[in-house]
């Protein structure tokens, strides 16, 4: 029976504990196992049992409406915007309102810098854990121990995985990092909230697959004519509409939401 290495993809006629070509340990899988049916079985649509888990609401009505009723457990959400738009501020406010065990992983700011921002927002919850880490494998290890309801990655361009030898922020690293974290979210049922940088062309920095690999894409943009106005909208939403947007103002105490969400393309007053 032939075996293929999951690391270098070379094929070998016999099993080895380590790949004879690349040296990876426990990486050889039989061809039959690699392309087998797996653990799950096809189920007819009428026979699917159970109901979807309830959405996790932020208690911010305009934001929950924007998502279609709140976060869907096990989903992946990408939040992108220009530097200084308030992405980290928004994330901390969401974690405070949800009030569930959460892990905020930063690969750019120190945890001390995040703590200073949290102090300014008067956030001091024992349910919010901060971690400076860029290795996806180690992050998943912390997930197994903490069992968070929400995982924040800030930012995905700073992360890397041992499965790729490319530099952090490169297309291979972003692809492997996003898919590894998304698989973990599906398996454990936590909400994955990924923060990404935005380019001048209004695209997520890195390969376009960053947007294709998640369930929801949120843009946080600065409003025209004023330095404190922000616009938040979904360019992609598998669980709701993309026609609405949130209007916000940046203040000393954080981002304030306008009571009503506007329609995409409407004038801001």
Which residues does each predicted region cover?
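Residues immediately within or flanking Cys/His clusters that coordinate Zn2+
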Residues: 2, 16
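Cys/His-rich metal-chelating microdomains
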Residues: 11-15, 25-28
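Short beta-alpha junctions and helix-cap segments that line functional grooves
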Residues: 94, 117, 203-207, 230-234, ...
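P-loop NTPase motor core
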Residues: 78, 89, 131-220, 225-228
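The Walker A/P-loop phosphate-binding site
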Residues: 37-121
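Conserved P-loop NTPase
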Residues: 20-28, 32-45, 49, 144-146, ...
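Short cysteine-rich clusters marking metal-coordination/redox-active sites
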Residues: 5-8, 19-22
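Residues at the starts of beta-strands that form the adenosine-phosphate
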Residues: 101-102, 127, 191
């Amino acid at each position: 029976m032939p075996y293929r290495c999951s690391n270098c993809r070379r094929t070998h006629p016999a099993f080895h504990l380590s790949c004879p070509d690349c040296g990876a340990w426990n990486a050889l899988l039989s061809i039959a196992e690699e392309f087998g049916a797996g653990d799950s079985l096809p189920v007819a649509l009428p026979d699917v049992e159970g109901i979807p888990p309830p959405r996790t609401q932020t208690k911010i009505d305009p934001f929950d409406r924007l998502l279609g009723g709140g976060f869907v457990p096990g989903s992946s959400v990408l939040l992108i915007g220009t530097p200084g738009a308030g992405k980290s501020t928004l994330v901390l406010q969401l974690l405070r309102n949800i009030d569930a065990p959460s892990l905020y992983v930063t690969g750019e700011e120190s945890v001390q810098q995040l703590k200073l921002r949290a102090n300014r927002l008067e956030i001091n919850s024992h349910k919010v854990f901060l971690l400076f880490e860029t290795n996806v494998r180690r992050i998943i290890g912390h997930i197994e121990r903490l069992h968070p309801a929400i995982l924040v990655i800030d930012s995905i361009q700073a992360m890397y995985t041992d499965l790729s030898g490319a530099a952090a922020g490169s297309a291979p690293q972003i692809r492997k990092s996003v898919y590894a974290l998304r698989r973990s979210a599906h398996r454990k049922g936590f909400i994955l909230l990924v923060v990404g940088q935005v380019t001048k062309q209004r695209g997520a920095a890195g390969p376009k697959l960053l947007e294709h690999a998640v369930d929801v894409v949120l843009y946080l943009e600065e409003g025209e004519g004023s330095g404190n106005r922000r616009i938040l909208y979904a360019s992609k939403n598998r669980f709701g509409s993309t026609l609405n947007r949130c209007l916000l103002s940046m203040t000393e105490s954080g981002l304030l939401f306008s009571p009503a969400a506007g329609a995409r393309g409407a004038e801001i007053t």
